[in-house]
Amino acid sequence: MATWNASQIILNSMSNIIESPQSKPRPVMASNGASLFIPVTMEVPCDQGTRMWWAFLASSMVTFFGGLFIILVWRTFKYLWTVCCHCGGKNKEAQKVVNVASSQVTDGDYKPTDDKEEVGVAEVGWMTSVKDWAGVMISAQTLTGRVLVVTVFALSIGALMIYFIDSSNPIESCQNFYKDFTLQIDMAFNIFFLLYFGLRFIAANDKLWFWLEVNSVVDFFTVPPVFVSVYLNRSWLGLRFLRALRLIQFSEILQFLNILKTSNSIKLVNLCSIFISTWLTAAGFIHLVENSGDPWRNFENSQDLSYWECMYLLMVTMSTVGYGDVYAKTTLGRLFMVFFILGGLAMFASYVPEIIELIGNRKKYGGSYSAVSGRKHIVVCGHITLESVSNFLKDFLHKDRDDVNVEIVFLHNISPNLELEALFKKHFTQVEFYQGSVLNPHDLARVKIESADACLILANKYCADPDAEDASNIMRVISIKNYHPKIRIITQMLQYHNKAHLLNIPSWNWKDGDDAICLAELKLGFIAQSCLAQGLSTMLANLFSMRSFIKIEEDTWQKYYLEGVANEMYTEYLSSAFVGLSFPAVCELCFVKLKLLMIAIEYKSEKGESRILINPGNHMKIKEGTLGFFIASDAKEVKRAFFYCKACHDDITDPKRIKKCACKRLEDEQPSALSPKKKQRNGGMRHSPNTSPNMMRHDPLLMTGNDQIDNMDSSSVKRYDSTGMFHWCPAKELDKVLLTRSEAAMTVLSGHVVVCIFGDMTSALIGVRNLVMPLRASNFHYHELKHIVFVGSLDYIKREWETLHNFPKVSILPGTPLSRADLRAVNINLCDMCVILSANQNNIDDTSLQDKECILASLNIKSMQFDDSIGLLQANSQGFTPPGMERSSPDNSPLHGVARQASITTGANIPIITELVNDSNVQFLDQDDDDDPDTELYLTQPFACGTAFAVSVLDSLMSATYFNDNILTLIRTLVTGGATPELEALVAEENALRGGYSTPQTLANRDRCRVAQLALYDGPFADLGDGGCYGDLYCKALKTYNMLCFGIYRLRDAHISTPSQCTKRYVITNPPYEFELVPTDLIFCLMQFDHNASQSRASLSHSSHSSHSSSKKSSSVTSILHTASANRQNRVKARDSRDKQKMGQAEKKWYTDETENNYPRNIQIKPMSTHMANQINQYKSTSSLIPPIREVEDEC
């Protein structure tokens, strides 16, 4: 009956349409009297009481399975055609080959005779071109393809929005296409989707797999129902929610638009899009079945749920909460929930935590640096750890640097740990951290490297492979320079030979401020200077590090040491009041009046080149705009040299009152060198050695035609390297410098340097050349060079020998520094310095064990006992030696008096400097100190005494170089013996020094100052040694001998009134004027090159160690101990004559230090006869005096 009523209603409606096509909808009465309002259109009438969902679903299913059936039939037909015609195809192909061959035989050229083949080829080409065109249209490789892909995605999201709007209506309802605006828009969208589907179908290589793709399935179940809706005048939500699956392609769309560039951002968007699209799609299915009901139950169990309630239900289901307020009632809904909860739970548990982690990390260390107006920033990269960053920030942000208006941006590819993060938060106002790599241009853009003031690259000083670490830093330099060639880069390098690779970078230019701080070069240079003046390594390390002043009231050695530690190196332009004065006069005025210690100036030549001159002497006159190098406690004190005015400040006694006056001076226009930005970019001070021939004093060495040049240097003999900065000899074979233990025992070495090396074939190279070069500087005369004896593994030394074979006075004893027999063979108790180095740092998990060999060797030497007969001999052969003190032999010691304990009976008195890798291991070197393990290195007794050195003290050079690159030039000039960029380029080319002929230009490079220690017990300064003032000593040494004093090396217990047996000394840097001296003090000084030392070895007192001066007062120094020197020379000659007589009986030839007949003034260690060897052994056993074997040498 109900079916008949529905049919009657439809017939009545159709009759109305036929009678009046323009009639409006009107109520139709059913047989049961019910009134139904049905919108009537021209096409098909809509009945609200009838459900037509099957028609919409059938359209999609017919489209999907119909197309799938056609594709399968076509593939089957094609396969059968290929199989059936396979044999026939072979016959045709064979016939074709025969025809071609016959055609070539008759005509000579191949001419196609089958016109049908031409048509086939043309048809295939047309189909291929259409397919290629469709592929280009839908690909993102072209602009058109990208626009089309983005448009399709945007329209899919629009269709999904229309679905959200329609979801508030019933699942199925009557709608007039001409009046429903949303249906019209949805129709337009789906027409576009249909066209795009056709392009994709044409471009697809495999039609079957294309038909089964997710995007194709979405089109099947969303496009056909729209056309059915127009025809039936009714709407069915159906499966339109499948458009949410298009969100999976969101990350691809953003990549096409170049919005997503990093892997983390792509991963984050992928996870979010998959999660959201799955959530929305599942919610749409639940919304459909719950609002429709089960078909087999005649849709009676439906419930009214909005789409958003379904989303809520799916979320609480995935999270396994399940409150129960909303739940599925239909069988289809519950069945779907059973399967969805398995996948949804897995997705929720894996995707959500990962999304939260990515979002958290991205907000923390992502993003880009925002530059602050008026504030500079630097980028720090490389080895970023808690230790390296804390050391860097401690020195860079030190309060003594005045106001540092620079922001520090750290860039590293690993996120910081909690401790490092806390350090960044502590300095959050000046420090920022970004996660990334300098090898990635995108990350360089994030930190604004193009606007950065400089880029600093830190190295891992404790790595197992130094060459690999240097290679990494060089790659960082290449990447940064490739991104921005003009950026200033300061990088740390571990190995000296790797600095050469930086010269291969086209945009690397040290004249523009680029610097490479070679840790091995400077570390070994510091240690080498300690061989010449013990304790100097500690003083220099403290000068170039920022230390806060620590006040101690007790009268202990720590009080005076810490007062000196507070001093640093600064630069400042000199006031015009100093113009025209000589360098010593300015130094005296600054020290006495301004309480400043000036040690060097920057000299600008007429060509505009700049050079750093260290204590140039009284011939140098100060010019306008001269830059001075000062030792002071803070930057404000150095400003006195810039503000000083003779008219206003001449009568002021308090230096704190010297401030800027009202006088108009030219200095006001000069920029301050204390600015964090480097002011001088000409780089001339590093263009050549620190001296220049045209500004040397007029002494006999440089006078043309002088006999000295003819006598000292022949044009046919090479004694110096090509730059004239170092002593040089022809390359020697390794076997010629080897000593056996017996040979070394028969050679009484004295005043030499013993270098103990721990290394093997697998150890990283130390770069011992950097230790030897400062000891072979040309500002020493040949007879002043200390003999160097290496004790260590021969396999390791062979690897280093290529860089050492051009240096004179070098010997090797294969053995181990832990062997007391080897140490006694090289007379370690008579050495001027024992250096302990280690290269065994590989594969050690515990960092505290990296120094085990060096610590064991140091303790081993200190526990050795010696016979004091050798010491008595040395003491008796040298006059004017204070009690408990002894001077080195003038023939072996370059400084004529570096203090050393006489009559050494215990190894504790042997001067030793030990290299440490781990700072905390310094506590094991001295057993009698009370240093706490947590004490900083510079506060420990071994470091204060100059017996320990660690590479960590060089960390401060990074910040010091950034604020003023002249500082690095000064320190390299002081510790390397005169290494220049030209010499580095030469070493990079040949990996060895090249000999050069002696010319006036190269000989002029010898005229540069050197560091020495001045004894106060006897000599011209003896009157000041007992209670005198340090300021009086400073002025007297400067006026009389052009010697610039800058520190004291004092006995540790000198302040104690009772006598002490302790021979340890500590360093006092830049003591004040009124500082009281004691007789046992040794004074650090910068002395001039002595041109007359080659004429007379004993022309100076062993106590004064003063250099030659053009002043007439220099003659008084020669006459002070003339008698003692003459007597000593007579003893030397008598002893040498006896040795020559005994050597005539020798049966064995020993090595010569240089090639025979090549160097007329060579050193020869003369052989001994068997009788003399037995006699020496007898002397050793009976504690008799051993006559030392002297070296026969001529002076150069």
From Swiss-Prot:
Q: Which residues lie on this side of the membrane: Cytoplasmic?
A: 74-146, 204-207, 254-268, 357-1196
> Where in or outside the cell?
Cell membrane
Polar residues bias (residue ranges): 1120-1129
The biased composition feature labelled Low complexity covers 1098-1119
Q: Where is this region: Segment S10?
A: 943-963
InterPro entries in the record: Ion_trans_dom, K_chnl_BK_asu, K_chnl_Slo-like, NAD(P)-bd_dom_sf, RCK_N, Slowpoke-like_C
Map out region (Disordered) in residue numbers.
672-697, 1098-1149
Record-annotated RCK N-terminal domain positions:
375-517, 750-894
Q: Where does the chain bind Mg(2+)?
A: E407, Q430, E432
Positions occupied by motif Calcium bowl:
914-936
Q: Give the binding site residues for Ca(2+).
A: Q923, D926, D929, D931
Motif (Selectivity for potassium) positions are 320-323
Q: Which residues lie on this side of the membrane: Extracellular?
A: 1-52, 168-182, 229-232, 290-303, 327-335
Ranges that cross the membrane: 53-73, 147-167, 183-203, 208-228, 233-253, 269-289, 336-356
Q: Which segments are annotated intramembrane?
A: 304-326
Residue ranges annotated as coiled coil are none
- What residue spans carry the region label Segment S7? 524-544
Q: Which residue stretches belong to region Segment S8?
A: 581-601
Q: What does this chain do?
A: Potassium channel activated by both membrane depolarization or increase in cytosolic Ca(2+) that mediates export of K(+). It is also activated by the concentration of cytosolic Mg(2+). Its activation dampens the excitatory events that elevate the cytosolic Ca(2+) concentration and/or depolarize the cell membrane. It therefore contributes to repolarization of the membrane potential.
Domain comment? The S0 segment is essential for the modulation by the accessory beta subunits. The S4 segment, which is characterized by a series of positively charged amino acids at every third position, is part of the voltage-sensor.
Instruction: Write out the similarity annotation.
Output: Belongs to the potassium channel family. Calcium-activated (TC 1.A.1.3) subfamily. KCa1.1/KCNMA1 sub-subfamily.
* Assembly and oligomerization: Homotetramer; which constitutes the calcium-activated potassium channel.
Query: Could you identify this protein by its name?
Result: Calcium-activated potassium channel subunit alpha-1
**Species name:** Xenopus laevis (African clawed frog)
